[in-house]
Amino acid sequence: MIEFVRGEVAYVCAEFVTIEVGGIGYKIVAPNPFFYRTGDEQVIVYTYHYVREDQEVLFGFRSRRERALFTKLLGVTGIGPKGSLAIVASGDVDALVEAIEQEKESYLIKFPGVGKKTAKQMTLDLKGKLAELAPDYIPSEGLFAQGNAELNEACEALTALGYSEREVEKVKKALQGEVLSTDQYVKRALQLLLNVR
């Protein structure tokens, strides 16, 4: 199985993104393809290889958590890959996990293709099985965790520019799947922050 694809964004459309790796273009169906931009130097897309008799699709996600949620949703009776992808695209992982654990069907029916019956099935099939996706399960690494030195430096620069820890953390999460220089991280983060404000 392919764990992830790291490469340049060659093409983006409403349904998929093409990542070029060593001269080969991987067509990856993603929840929000327009998150990626053509010309991005290096991105990491966490993949799920979906194989059935009649189709073979490579699905891609910005984080391992998104991918884990997608695979859990595939196990729900009545939700296929399209439905799972739409839910991941429309929702926040933390809010969705909370809604399932607390059986908030009114929240779940807001997703495309999810009615009362499917919402009930989601809580029935997934309640108690999403511990690894719950926010308090994730190891608390702090804002400037080890791992990506360039991204951490960019976060420090944003803090020095006066952005709040909350804003910086949000941007850091959005950029974790990308491999950029410190300057490129800062530029990309500022673009994201200016769009939010």
From Swiss-Prot:
Keywords: Cytoplasm, DNA damage, DNA recombination, DNA repair, DNA-binding. Homotetramer. Forms an RuvA(8)-RuvB(12)-Holliday junction (HJ) complex. HJ DNA is sandwiched between 2 RuvA tetramers; dsDNA enters through RuvA and exits via RuvB. An RuvB hexamer assembles on each DNA strand where it exits the tetramer. Each RuvB hexamer is contacted by two RuvA subunits (via domain III) on 2 adjacent RuvB subunits; this complex drives branch migration. In the full resolvosome a probable DNA-RuvA(4)-RuvB(12)-RuvC(2) complex forms which resolves the HJ. Residues 141-145 are annotated as: Flexible linker. Coiled coil: none annotated. It comes from the Bacteria. This is Holliday junction branch migration complex subunit RuvA. Belongs to the RuvA family. Has three domains with a flexible linker between the domains II and III and assumes an 'L' shape. Domain III is highly mobile and contacts RuvB. The RuvA-RuvB-RuvC complex processes Holliday junction (HJ) DNA during genetic recombination and DNA repair, while the RuvA-RuvB complex plays an important role in the rescue of blocked DNA replication forks via replication fork reversal (RFR). RuvA specifically binds to HJ cruciform DNA, conferring on it an open structure. The RuvB hexamer acts as an ATP-dependent pump, pulling dsDNA into and through the RuvAB complex. HJ branch migration allows RuvC to scan DNA until it finds its consensus sequence, where it cleaves and resolves the cruciform DNA. GO terms for molecular function: ATP binding; four-way junction DNA binding; four-way junction helicase activity. Residues 63-141 are annotated as: Domain II. InterPro entries: DNA_helicase_Holl-junc_RuvA_I, NA-bd_OB-fold, RuvA, RuvA_2-like, RuvA_C, RuvA_C_sf. The keyword Electron transport does not apply. GO terms for biological process: DNA recombination; DNA repair. Residues 146-197 are annotated as: Domain III. It comes from Exiguobacterium sibiricum (strain DSM 17290 / CCUG 55495 / CIP 109462 / JCM 13490 / 255-15). Pfam families: HHH_5, RuvA_C, RuvA_N. Transmembrane segments: none annotated.
